[in-house]
């Protein structure tokens, strides 16, 4: 029995020593996995009522949220965790016994002011009447995501609003930090995972990571950081997207076959084999050299063999890589990207027509016309057309009104 307990102690110690994280930045816009399609608005101001509030607004000093259960099995740094709480300063911790919430003033990670077992978007602040932390679970077992969303939050020391989330993913035990919506121009944050006071995994640029999302309330402009448990593989090309145009003119063939790839490995990628097939046909493979894709960055890979379609029509294009740096790809299931392209004989360029209705009896119309004219003057000539109609209202209407406009 003593020998079994000793062996168990050794195994658990090995798990603890080997547990770690690495992170990859997203290179395409949107939410991780596409499960959360909700719009990003304040609580009570457009946010779906399916979210549950876990904090109170108006936190002039940092406060903790309520303690919440994770709705599925989840490991942090190799050990099971079941509950969490969140500070209004942007820190989620699995150490629910932590007493003092982190300061609104961000710092470098690791930091003695951050509890062990924490995920940080440090530099957020919740003093406003709309600054509320909410939670929601998306998807179905065993691939659910639990979102903790800082809705309509402040960036400490800035007069602006910003929206961020921390996401826990079932089965993979991945943690995502999602940059969702932002009006800040000078705010920055300390983003990362703190295991303890001596160990942290941070996003490059911390504690001064700037938001990348715009004011768009949809996920279309979202950006995220993916924290992955375990050791980073040495060679791992991750397919982002095929970058061939959606529509191709047959007479312009042959076409370069290109795709964007993220280097998810620890080694810089200097060579690889590029492959593509059309409509599931015979693969076209060729070696690509002269690459220089640093770890955590993206680049476009161009296949040495161009494609000449046989005729107009719709084609399914599959592009994948293999043999990065002359070695086996350590994670081959993320190498492939697909796209449908349409080959046509010609393309007609269409210019939008803008119709404007105005009148000399309309007070706001004069400044609006001035603004509109200035805006149109910034556009490229020939890219648009507009027509202005003089109207019979309000009041007696414009003296230049004609019945054709009515």
Predicted segment positions?
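Bacterial Sec-dependent N-terminal signal peptides
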Residues: 1-22, 230-233, 258
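Extracytoplasmic Ser/Thr/Pro-rich, glycosylation-prone low-complexity segments
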Residues: 19-236
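Residue-level signal for well-ordered, solvent-exposed loop/turn and beta-edge residues enriched
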Residues: 20, 79, 174, 267, ...
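Short, solvent-exposed loop/turn and secondary-structure capping segments
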Residues: 95-98, 159-160, 365-369, 375, ...
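Active-site-proximal beta-strand/loop segments in catalytic clefts of secreted hydrolases
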Residues: 149-153, 179-181, 355-360, 389-393
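Extracellular/luminal regions of secreted and cell-surface proteins that mediate adhesion/ECM remodeling
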Residues: 231-350
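Local sequence-structure signature of Cys/Sec-based thiol-disulfide redox active-site neighborhoods
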Residues: 346-389
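Thiol-based oxidoreductase modules, predominantly thioredoxin-like and allied folds used
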Residues: 380-405
């Amino acid at each position: 029995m003593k020998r079994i307990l000793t062996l168990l102690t050794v195994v658990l110690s090995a798990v603890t020593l080997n547990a770690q994280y690495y992170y990859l930045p997203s290179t395409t816009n949107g939410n991780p996995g596409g499960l959360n399609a909700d719009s990003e608005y304040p609580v009570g101001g457009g946010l779906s009522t399916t979210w549950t509030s876990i904090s109170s607004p108006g936190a002039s000093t940092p406060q903790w949220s309520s303690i919440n259960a994770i709705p599925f099995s989840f490991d942090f740094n190799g050990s099971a965790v079941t509950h969490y709480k969140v500070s209004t300063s942007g820190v989620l911790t699995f150490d629910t016994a932590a007493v003092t919430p982190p300061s609104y003033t961000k710092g470098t990670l690791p930091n003695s002011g951050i509890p062990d077992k924490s995920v940080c978007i440090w530099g957020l602040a919740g003093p406003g009447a709309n600054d509320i932390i909410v939670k929601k679970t998306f998807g179905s077992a065993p691939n659910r995501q639990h979102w903790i969303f800082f809705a309509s939050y402040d960036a400490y020391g800035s007069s602006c609003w910003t929206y961020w989330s921390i996401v826990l993913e079932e089965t993979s035990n991945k943690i995502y930090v999602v940059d969702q919506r932002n009006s800040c121009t000078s705010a920055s944050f300390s983003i990362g995972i703190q295991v303890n006071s001596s160990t942290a995994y941070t996003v490059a640029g911390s504690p001064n990571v700037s938001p990348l999302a715009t004011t768009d309330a949809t996920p279309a402009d979202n950006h995220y950081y993916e924290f992955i448990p375990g050791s980073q593989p040495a060679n791992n090309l991750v397919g982002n997207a095929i970058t061939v145009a959606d529509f191709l003119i047959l007479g312009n063939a042959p076409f370069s076959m290109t795709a964007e790839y993220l280097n998810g490995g620890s080694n810089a990628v200097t060579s690889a084999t590029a492959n593509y097939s059309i409509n599931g046909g015979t693969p076209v493979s060729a070696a690509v050299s002269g690459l220089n894709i640093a770890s955590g960055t993206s680049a476009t890979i161009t296949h040495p063999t161009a494609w000449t379609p046989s005729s107009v029509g719709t084609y399914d294009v599959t592009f994948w890589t293999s043999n990065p740096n002359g070695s086996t790809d350590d994670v081959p299931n993320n190498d492939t990207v697909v796209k449908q392209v349409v080959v046509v004989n010609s393309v007609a360029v269409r210019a939008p027509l803008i119709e404007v209705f105005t009148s000399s009896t309309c007070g706001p119309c004069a400044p609006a016309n001035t603004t509109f004219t200035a805006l149109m003057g910034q556009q490229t000539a020939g890219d648009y057309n507009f027509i202005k109609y003089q109207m019979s209202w309000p009041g007696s209407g414009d003296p230049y009104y004609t019945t054709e406009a009515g």
